[in-house]
Amino acid sequence: MVVKVGINGFGRIGRLAFRRIQNIEGVEVTRINDLTDPNMLAHLLKYDTTQGRFDGTVEVKEGGFEVNGNFIKVSAERDPENIDWATDGVEIVLEATGFFAKKEAAEKHLHANGAKKVVITAPGGNDVKTVVFNTNHDILDGTETVISGASCTTNCLAPMAKALHDAFGIQKGLMTTIHAYTGDQMILDGPHRGGDLRRARAGAANIVPNSTGAAKAIGLVIPELNGKLDGAAQRVPVPTGSVTELVVTLDKNVSVDEINSAMKAASNDSFGYTEDPIVSSDIVGVSYGSLFDATQTKVMEVDGSQLVKVVSWYDNEMSYTAQLVRTLEYFAKIAK
């Protein structure tokens, strides 16, 4: 049985999700909704500065475009309630615009001739289940209509924090994501549409302090860590490839080797482990949601207690997208 998917919003995440779905048997994108001209969408699908050229054929046709010989309808509806997903058999919508990230807004896809399920590609709030695949995807029972795939940083932080907490118990912690610049920053100095004075500065020429909700959102993914973590972000002049540092106090004293052994034991398709001396460009395109770097683990003795620092890499574009697609595929499989 083929699961038919619709993508609302064909930006960075929407296009990369489309790419990944091309390689998954039993999942097919049948409609894309985006306000941008299809010629532009096809061009941006075919050519990608950070992730490389699309490995396939893309040809614009009337009403959409043809990818590897398969026609995908493209519509341009502003209101999700007006998207006729059912005509193309769409069962699950990947909501990737950033504008319909709350449950009530995302549910518009389910109205009229809508779909059956929605996966939001952003933090969704307390009234939807927030899923980081291979960390807490077992909270889903298939009856849900709208779920959130969290954020790219939460997908990096959560498996590392869970492995640390399961093994040693986290008391409190501070995280910092050293994050690639994104499309919500200015390329050159100029007014920021959201009024953020720092994001109004040239993203490719500055380290830009920024907020992140990843640490606080961790409680939606790992309830036992609710209220125990806080953090911030530093946007840096690279187009993709980011890293999360987590500094914590633990319930017990540990060694670097013990921490690294626990992380290696917890590794899986979503949470990788490396002892190589890598840099950010080395993780562009990786499918791990989080790649633990054992070379950066630190333990400091402080008056009989310890401060522990752990570090994990992520491609804020592809790592996150890979996790979203894993979640979508699983959600479709258990749907009731």
Swiss-Prot record:
Enumerate the active-site residues.
C152
PROSITE patterns assigned to the protein according to its UniProt record, in alphabetical order: GAPDH
Major location (coarse): cytoplasm
What does it catalyze?
D-glyceraldehyde 3-phosphate + phosphate + NAD(+) = (2R)-3-phospho-glyceroyl phosphate + NADH + H(+)
Q: Give UniProt keywords alphabetically.
A: Cytoplasm, Glycolysis, NAD, Nucleotide-binding, Oxidoreductase
Q: What does this protein do?
A: Also binds human plasminogen.
Q: Which NCBIfam families match?
A: GAPDH-I (TIGR01534)
- Name it: Glyceraldehyde-3-phosphate dehydrogenase
Q: Write down the species.
A: Streptococcus pyogenes
Q: Which gene encodes it?
A: gap
